A protein has these predicted regions:
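Extreme N-terminal starter segment of soluble prokaryotic enzymes
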Residues: 1-4
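Acetyl-CoA-dependent GNAT
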Residues: 6-12, 16-96, 107-109, 113, ...
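Residues that form or flank phosphate/diphosphate-binding pockets in enzymes
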Residues: 83, 101, 133
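Active-site acidic-Proline motif in GNAT/NAT acetyltransferases
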Residues: 94-100, 129-130
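Short glycine-rich hinge loops at helix-strand junctions in the catalytic core
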Residues: 101, 118, 142
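Residues forming the Rossmann-fold NAD(P)(H) cofactor-binding site
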Residues: 104
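C-terminal "cap" of GNAT-fold acetyltransferases
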Residues: 121-136, 140-175
Length: 175
């Protein structure tokens, strides 16, 4: 069973390593959430992770199994139309431990914290639109397509697309 706690600065390297191994490169192919065929490079850096941990309007939740960080999610408080919502991102589970329910319980734990601490009225996230398996996974957790899309962000210092025309699709869950 996973135990959860909010990340601290001491966790920065472990978080960046886990997120990058789950999203990109050959190690990510051990799981079902890989972006290795879509993007080269890194998903995040230790600097980005540290800045998220330091924010008052965000937290990174860690899933720990047998004293090892195996899952992570970033939750940011935002205001949309005058209402508190939470944006979920950087959701990662160690590739060799995916498909065991850890991702679902991680998301539910982050949602519970955001509901309790921020009194949010909903959640949203962005996924690469051609990742139908991810959209289906999030749909099983109550997230629905919003019909909103945006171009995939350019960050040539970190990642390079392997395919053209990537975009992000927004999903939302109303409480």
């Amino acid at each position: 069973m996973l135990n959860f706690h909010k990340a601290e600065l001491i966790d920065v390297s472990a978080i960046a390593e886990l997120v990058n191994s789950a999203y990109r490169g050959e190690s990510s192919r051990a799981g079902w959430t890989t972006e290795a065929d879509l993007l080269d490079g890194l998903r995040t850096t230790t600097q980005e992770v540290a800045s998220m941990i330091k924010r008052d309007d965000a937290f990174i939740l860690l899933g720990v199994l047998n004293d090892q960080v195996i899952a992570t999610i970033c939750c940011e408080r935002q205001v949309a139309h005058g209402r508190n919502i939470a944006h979920l991102g950087m959701i990662a589970v160690k590739p060799s431990l995916q498909n065991r329910g850890h991702g679902a319980v991680l998301i539910q734990a982050a949602e519970a914290i955001a509901l309790r601490e921020w009194r949010v009225v909903g959640f949203h996230m962005a996924v690469i639109s051609i990742r139908n398996e991810l959209v289906a996974f999030y749909a099983r957790l109550g997230y629905a397509r919003t019909g909103e899309f945006t171009d995939f962000p350019v960050n040539s210092a970190l990642w390079q697309p392997k395919v053209t025309g990537l975009n992000l699709e927004y999903l939302a869950k109303v409480i």
